[in-house]
């Protein structure tokens, strides 16, 4: 799947900045259709008033935010530009953004299943390929030289994962 991302000129995550900050597809840019406060407001309205009221306000906010992106980030792209658009599940938010870009004339594509589907694909791929690797665990007391051993193994060209080093221990 990741190799297929090369078919696109850009990968656009339209989720809120908070969602994007938690995790996103590597290399994606964040052009949110709802900011953090707007997303919370829509969620509250959906649960406390009605889905209809939330969708009505959401459509107005999303439309306004897409217009802002068109007048700023997306101003200079040529007609041949090919963006891939995604949100959490590949539904309303990315659907609205993709629809507008396609109506303009760009060849926008919506990521089926959204970020949730992307994560599922990556996890499934890791689970399928895990048996192709040989994992060796090096353990020992603090100060016993585990990091030094891993560094030597890495210098020989082997792939290593130094969890203590990553944790700055």
Where are these regions (language model features)?
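Cytosolic catalytic domains that perform sulfur/thiol-centered chemistry
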Residues: 1-109, 130-132, 136-148, 155-168
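Long, charge-dense
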Residues: 110-123, 131
